[in-house]
């Protein structure tokens, strides 16, 4: 499939989606949203892909939603079109996803990064939800995912003031998985994605599902759900291979079945 606002690359078992609207600091208009979602879904459906990286440019991962596109919307327009609903499909991708963030990740850009399972930030990254400065509030999950990631007090601080935080503060707050020098960002993201992609695909998807369930259920429900997924893993060929390889002191050869 041909895309106009993103670049898509396959590198062995890793899929890489690069936002490519440099003239607009990768602002997320409807076309970008649709293309990112379409590419992620396509990669998710590919059995030869075991991890997906989403990244932007050195200056901006994504500087937010495209304000020019939204400025003249009425309530009826936004509500009827269910604006931003497209991103729900991206969040539902089962393949592990990695956000590789350099530069600005603001508003929708921060929300896009938070939809990913692992968030690796360059030391140049800046995060924030500045929507309040425009007379609105986060609409792509910012108020929900940010609060779950860094807690109510910190989320309130960022959302109500619209201020940004640098990569170091984001790491201390628990928003990002790790911070690396900007020149090493894609190397680190590719290495992490390659490591994940070499694991059993079914086990990786189950693990992702179990962790996500922790935010959506009580502890007892989450423990039961995890246990059922653990039991299910014993129906896979990869479980037999993984445990046999451990006993035989060799590297496992997963077939993702």
Curated annotation (Swiss-Prot):
UniProt GO molecular function: enoyl-CoA hydratase activity
EC top class named in words: lyase
Domain of life: Bacteria
Gene3D superfamilies (alphabetical): 2-enoyl-CoA Hydratase, Chain A, domain 1 (3.90.226.10), Lyase 2-enoyl-coa Hydratase, Chain A, domain 2 (1.10.12.10)
Example GO biological process: fatty acid beta-oxidation
Catalyzed reaction equations: a (3S)-3-hydroxyacyl-CoA = a (2E)-enoyl-CoA + H2O; a 4-saturated-(3S)-3-hydroxyacyl-CoA = a (3E)-enoyl-CoA + H2O
Residues in coiled coil: none
One cellular component term from this protein's GO annotations in UniProt: peptidoglycan-based cell wall
Keywords of the record: Fatty acid metabolism, Lipid metabolism, Lyase
Enzyme Commission number(s) from the entry: 4.2.1.17
InterPro entries for the chain: ClpP/crotonase-like_dom_sf, Enoyl-CoA_hyd/isom_CS, Enoyl-CoA_hydra/iso, Enoyl-CoA_hydra_C
Pfam families in the cross-refs: ECH_1
Family, as annotated: Belongs to the enoyl-CoA hydratase/isomerase family.
PANTHER family, sorted: ENOYL-COA HYDRATASE, MITOCHONDRIAL, ENOYL-COA HYDRATASE-RELATED
Function: Could possibly oxidize fatty acids using specific components.
Record protein name field: Probable enoyl-CoA hydratase EchA8
């Amino acid at each position: 499939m041909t895309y106009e606002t993103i670049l898509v690359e396959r590198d062995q078992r890793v899929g890489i989606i690069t936002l490519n609207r440099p003239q607009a600091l990768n602002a997320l208009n409807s076309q970008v949203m649709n293309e990112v979602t379409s590419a992620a879904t396509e990669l998710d459906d590919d059995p030869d892909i075991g991890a997906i990286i989403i990244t932007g440019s050195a200056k901006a991962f994504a500087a937010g939603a495209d304000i020019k596109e939204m400025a003249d919307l009425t309530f009826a327009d936004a509500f009827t079109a269910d604006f931003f609903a497209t991103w729900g499909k991206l969040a539902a991708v089962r393949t592990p996803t990695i956000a590789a963030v350099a530069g600005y990740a603001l508003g929708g850009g921060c929300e896009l990064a938070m939809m990913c399972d692992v968030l690796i930030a360059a030391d140049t990254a800046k995060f924030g939800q500045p929507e309040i400065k425009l007379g609105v509030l986060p609409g792509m999950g910012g108020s929900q995912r940010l609060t779950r990631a860094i807690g109510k007090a910190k989320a309130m601080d960022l959302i109500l003031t619209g201020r940004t935080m640098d990569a170091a503060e984001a790491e201390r707050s628990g928003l990002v998985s790790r911070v690396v020098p900007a020149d090493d960002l894609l190397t680190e993201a590719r290495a992490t994605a390659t490591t994940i992609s070499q694991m059993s695909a079914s086990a990786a998807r189950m693990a992702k599902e179990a962790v996500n369930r922790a935010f959506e259920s009580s502890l007892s429900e989450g423990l039961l759900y995890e246990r059922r997924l653990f039991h299910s893993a014993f129906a896979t060929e990869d479980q037999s291979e993984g445990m046999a390889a451990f006993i035989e002191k060799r590297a496992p050869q997963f077939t993702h079945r």
